Regions:
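Structural/interface elements that position substrates and couple domains in central-metabolism enzymes
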Residues: 1-226
Length: 226
């Protein structure tokens, strides 16, 4: 019997509503003739501490037997299994993880804009706030979101919710703020050149860090290219 596992980040319901019907068109029955599960990829490119083996693995099957078979596969190479009750729950787990980062990055990006308006040093504010030992998690502002996950994944969730007549306003606002950050950065550059009586046109501008994060060569969705 074959095991099919979807790892790609996607909207809630994909495994059950899209993949399963295609497989069952063959006349085979899930949980009896084949096993189907969802287990989101959780690799962090460039992370020198967390890797495939020591990053807990979310696993959920269409049936309990599917979950068990998927666990048997992954536990050969991954230390910790985290089974959840349904493929939909597993799909939302990954979306929550990346939406959490997107929303918090949007918050600190807006704080950067606020500090700029108030003529304050945002880095001083963040470092001081980071001394609080509880109830605070440090995020840093930047020119926006990049990579093949964070800029895209929240839209899977907001799209699905729109089909249910609900608008995820908080998530969509975060995406809007992050998308606008490259323009905030270019305006800062323009202002700096203007103070030096130079125009953007004709100026030599060095861009360091074209990839979406340090120590990798992936430029997908990199805000530096905007």
């Amino acid at each position: 019997k074959q095991l099919i596992v979807l790892e790609s980040t996607t909207y809630p319901g994909t495994t059950r509503e899209l993949i399963l019907p295609i497989l069952e068109e063959t006349g085979l029955k899930v949980g009896e003739d084949f096993y189907l599960a969802f287990s989101p990829e959780r690799i962090d490119p460039g992370n020198k501490f967390y890797n495939t083996r020591n990053t807990p693995k979310i696993v959920a099957g269409i049936t309990p037997k599917c979950t068990e078979v998927a666990k048997l596969l992954y536990q050969q190479v991954i230390d910790t299994m985290v089974p959840v009750s349904s493929t939909e729950a597993a799909e939302v787990v990954k979306l929550l993880e990346n939406t959490f980062r997107s929303v918090n990055i949007a918050l600190v990006n807006e704080v950067a804009i606020i500090c700029n308006k108030l003529k304050l040093n945002v880095w001083e504010v963040i470092e001081a706030a980071a001394t609080k030992p509880f109830g605070y998690m440090t995020f840093y502002p930047g020119p926006g979101l990049g990579g093949h996950c964070l800029p895209i994944d929240p839209y899977y969730l907001s799209w699905k919710l729109r089909t249910l007549n609900y608008r995820a306003r908080f998530i969509e606002l975060a995406s809007e703020i992050n998308t606008e950050m490259p323009y905030f950065v270019t305006n800062k550059i323009t202002d700096g050149l203007n103070r030096s009586r130079k125009s953007v046109n004709g100026s030599n501008i060095l861009v360091l860090g074209v990839a979406y994060k340090k120590d990798i060569n992936d430029v997908r969705e990199s805000p530096a290219l905007d």
